[in-house]
Regions:
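GNAT-family acyltransferases
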Residues: 1-105, 114, 118-122, 126, ...
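Conserved active-site alpha-helix within GNAT-family acetyltransferase domains
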Residues: 134-151
Length: 171
């Protein structure tokens, strides 16, 4: 199961491959935009000293972490990952996703998430998304996929649940 989740993902416009230490500079070039983090609980993740900690945790994530490359240019445009695997409960989480602002408002996030969800909905019955209640942009994105609010775990974390039966494929 773990190896299936961490295998590269190929979409029409993007290629998701496992993150490596050598990806730091390219990924930080995307993450260094303060506006990416304005609705995020860790609003200073654009700072290099803060991003280093995020990057290090991504490298040791037990399901790996993806760097997202735009196929047309081979440019790094973001990152995402699977985490929180619950094989008995048939659940996995998708998150820690960010993409460069030039892709906001395009079909990029939907294309990437749909490919990840396609992989999940063979073995899993639902996918969870942990999102800060203040992050309207991310909440809107998962709502478009069919995810519904489940519970608030803390002031900085609400859970949105996407059962396979509710998934709305975005094109």
């Amino acid at each position: 199961m773990r190896s299936q989740l961490s295998a590269p993902i190929d979409t029409t416009n993007f290629y998701l491959s496992l993150l490596h230490e050598t990806d730091f500079d390219d990924l930080y070039a995307v993450a260094s935009d303060p506006l990416l983090w304005e609705q995020h609980p860790e609003r200073d993740r654009w700072r290099k000293d803060v991003f280093v900690l995020f990057f290090q945790s991504a490298l040791v994530n037990d399901l790996g972490c993806f760097v997202i490359r735009e196929k047309s240019s081979d440019r790094v445009v973001g990152s995402t990952r699977f985490y929180g695997l619950d094989e008995l409960g048939g659940l996995v989480r998708i998150g820690f996703t960010f993409i460069e602002r030039s892709l906001w408002g395009t079909s990029a996030n939907a294309e990437i998430k749909n490919a990840m969800l396609t992989r999940c909905f063979g073995p899993f019955k639902a996918v969870l998304f942990d999102i800060a209640p203040s992050n309207r942009r991310s909440i809107g994105a998962v709502n478009k996929l069919g995810a519904i609010y489940s519970e608030t775990l803390s002031p900085t974390k609400a859970v949105y649940r996407l059962p396979k039966s509710h998934w709305i494929r975005q094109s």
